[in-house]
Amino acid sequence: MGLHLGLIDYGMGNLHSVEKAFNRLGHQPSRVVNPSDLDGCDALVLPGVGSFDPAIDNLQSTGLIPDLKRWNEADRPLLGICLGLQLLFESSAEGRLEGLGLIKGHVERLPIGAGARIPHMGWAPLDLRRANPMLAAADPLAWVYFVHSYAAVPERPETLAAAASFGSSSVTAMVWQRRLGACQFHPEKSSDSGSAMLKRWLDWLQRGAPIG
């Protein structure tokens, strides 16, 4: 039996490009627009493009927030992408609403004095800090595509899975916490590197999403 992926549709995600990326890997995600759509899902993908507060507002309107928290408490796989990563944290300097709080920490604006233009837009190599279901230490250097003005700051250092350079600073590129992971970059727009990472995540799910 194949994996049943749920793609959370709350009106602010780049759903079409994410769907196409999974289609190329032989998977057809189902769109999740309300709690009943979670039935039968093996793993969830939370994409996102836009601003923090409108995204939280939209998620609240779907009624999915309590279910996403229960999903995480049950240690079930979830992958956040771009704004989807930021929503996993407790709060953001971009807005006033509470985040999902699935990962301890906050989202802050990229540093103005780092000698780089905001938004951070374009390709950058990943600095792997901890092997995870999307990226292993033996993998080739991964160049990935970013578009963002804010970056997460995890409270626990071990949550940081990969970083990227932003001028003279280093910012969060990936986080991982048991079966909950996320990337600030867009794997669906990151050519072969992004496709390889999504495939690795799918293979991990097929193996039962082992921890460690």
From Swiss-Prot:
Location in the cell: Cytoplasm
Metabolic or biological pathway, per its Swiss-Prot or TrEMBL entry: Amino-acid biosynthesis; L-histidine biosynthesis; L-histidine from 5-phospho-alpha-D-ribose 1-diphosphate: step 5/9
Assembly: Heterodimer of HisH and HisF.
NCBIfam families: IMP_synth_hisH (TIGR01855)
General function of this protein: IGPS catalyzes the conversion of PRFAR and glutamine to IGP, AICAR and glutamate. The HisH subunit provides the glutamine amidotransferase activity that produces the ammonia necessary to HisF for the synthesis of IGP and AICAR.
PANTHER family, A to Z: IMIDAZOLE GLYCEROL PHOSPHATE SYNTHASE SUBUNIT HISH (PTHR42701:SF1)
Gene Ontology process terms (BP): L-histidine biosynthetic process
TM region(s), chain numbering: none
GO terms for MF: glutaminase activity; imidazoleglycerol-phosphate synthase activity; lyase activity
Positions of the catalytic residues: C82, H186, E188
Keywords: Amino-acid biosynthesis, Cytoplasm, Glutamine amidotransferase, Histidine biosynthesis, Hydrolase, Lyase
The Glutamine amidotransferase type-1 domain, residue ranges: 4-211
Reaction catalysed by this enzyme: 5-[(5-phospho-1-deoxy-D-ribulos-1-ylimino)methylamino]-1-(5-phospho-beta-D-ribosyl)imidazole-4-carboxamide + L-glutamine = D-erythro-1-(imidazol-4-yl)glycerol 3-phosphate + 5-amino-1-(5-phospho-beta-D-ribosyl)imidazole-4-carboxamide + L-glutamate + H(+); L-glutamine + H2O = L-glutamate + NH4(+)
Gene Ontology cellular component list: cytoplasm
Protein name as it appears in the record: Imidazole glycerol phosphate synthase subunit HisH 2
One Pfam family cited in the UniProt record for this chain: GATase
EC number: 4.3.2.10, 3.5.1.2
